[in-house]
Amino acid sequence: MSRSRSAAASSSQKPDDMDLMSPDGSASSPSAPNTPATNSGGFSSDRKKATHLRCERQRREAINSGYSDLKDLIPQTTTSLGCKTTNAAILFRACDFMSQLKTDISDADKQLAQLNAQAAALEMIASEYEQMASSVPDAGQSTIQVKMLQLLLDDCFTSFSSQVDFTTYATITRTLLSWVESLAPNAEPFKSTAGKMVTMPFTSP
């Protein structure tokens, strides 16, 4: 009786033992977790996170470097000395400095226009001098005429410099006409110059 029970128990355990064996006779566990796949997924997630952190760090370093370069380009002001420099303060100073540069450029353009107008007027005077000089006889022929012409031109240039406004082309035209009228024979400045020409002591060569 006990022998038959032992045989039955042995036969009931054989199917379980056979389930634990693989077709090639090795033991296997069908419910064991897939460890390599799990590790691979975790490694990929860590790598993405590390890449994201590295990119974010590089982005912040680039921003900080840009702010540092901008800070070096902006001149220091008395109000910024001794104060903590923030990014907002750097941007504010940059905007203020740009406004100042625009004002300086505008003033420089106005000054350049004024200098160009003055240069144009001086070129015109130089051209007139050249024409007058070409019509003057040789010094050996008429020294007195040369000295008279020199006195007249010097006096004219002095009055021209004091009466002609070189600010703009419009002011040059307006004041130049007034200056030309002052050279009329009946004008007092011309009479004064003519009197100097007549009374000055000339010496013959």
From Swiss-Prot:
<keyword id="KW-0804">Transcription</keyword>
<keyword id="KW-0175">Coiled coil</keyword>
<dbReference type="GO" id="GO:0010629">
    <property type="term" value="P:negative regulation of gene expression"/>
</dbReference>
<dbReference type="GO" id="GO:0006357">
    <property type="term" value="P:regulation of transcription by RNA polymerase II"/>
</dbReference>
<keyword id="KW-0805">Transcription regulation</keyword>
<dbReference type="InterPro" id="IPR036638">
    <property type="entry name" value="HLH_DNA-bd_sf"/>
</dbReference>
<dbReference type="GO" id="GO:0046983">
    <property type="term" value="F:protein dimerization activity"/>
</dbReference>
<feature type="coiled-coil region">
    <location>
        <begin position="98"/>
        <end position="132"/>
    </location>
</feature>
<dbReference type="Pfam" id="PF00010">
    <property type="entry name" value="HLH"/>
</dbReference>
<dbReference type="GO" id="GO:0000978">
    <property type="term" value="F:RNA polymerase II cis-regulatory region sequence-specific DNA binding"/>
</dbReference>
<feature type="domain" description="bHLH">
    <location>
        <begin position="47"/>
        <end position="101"/>
    </location>
</feature>
<feature type="compositionally biased region" description="Low complexity">
    <location>
        <begin position="1"/>
        <end position="12"/>
    </location>
</feature>
<dbReference type="GO" id="GO:0008340">
    <property type="term" value="P:determination of adult lifespan"/>
</dbReference>
<keyword id="KW-0963">Cytoplasm</keyword>
<dbReference type="InterPro" id="IPR052207">
    <property type="entry name" value="Max-like/E-box_TFs"/>
</dbReference>
<feature type="region of interest" description="Helix-loop-helix motif">
    <location>
        <begin position="61"/>
        <end position="101"/>
    </location>
</feature>
<dbReference type="InterPro" id="IPR011598">
    <property type="entry name" value="bHLH_dom"/>
</dbReference>
<protein>
    <recommendedName>
        <fullName>Max-like protein homolog 2</fullName>
    </recommendedName>
</protein>
<dbReference type="GO" id="GO:0000981">
    <property type="term" value="F:DNA-binding transcription factor activity, RNA polymerase II-specific"/>
</dbReference>
<keyword id="KW-0496">Mitochondrion</keyword>
<keyword id="KW-0539">Nucleus</keyword>
<feature type="compositionally biased region" description="Low complexity">
    <location>
        <begin position="26"/>
        <end position="40"/>
    </location>
</feature>
<feature type="region of interest" description="Disordered">
    <location>
        <begin position="1"/>
        <end position="58"/>
    </location>
</feature>
<dbReference type="GO" id="GO:0005737">
    <property type="term" value="C:cytoplasm"/>
</dbReference>
<keyword id="KW-0238">DNA-binding</keyword>
<comment type="function">
    <text>Transcription factor. Binds to the E box motif 5'-CACGTG-3', probably in a heterodimeric complex with mml-1. Involved in modulating longevity in response to TOR signaling, dietary restriction, the decline in protein homeostasis associated with normal aging, germline signaling and the insulin-like signaling pathway. Plays a role in autophagy. Involved in regulating migration of the ray 1 precursor cells in the male tail, acting in concert with Wnt and semaphorin signaling pathways.</text>
</comment>
<feature type="compositionally biased region" description="Basic and acidic residues">
    <location>
        <begin position="45"/>
        <end position="58"/>
    </location>
</feature>
<feature type="region of interest" description="Basic motif">
    <location>
        <begin position="47"/>
        <end position="60"/>
    </location>
</feature>
<dbReference type="GO" id="GO:0005634">
    <property type="term" value="C:nucleus"/>
</dbReference>
<dbReference type="GO" id="GO:0005739">
    <property type="term" value="C:mitochondrion"/>
</dbReference>
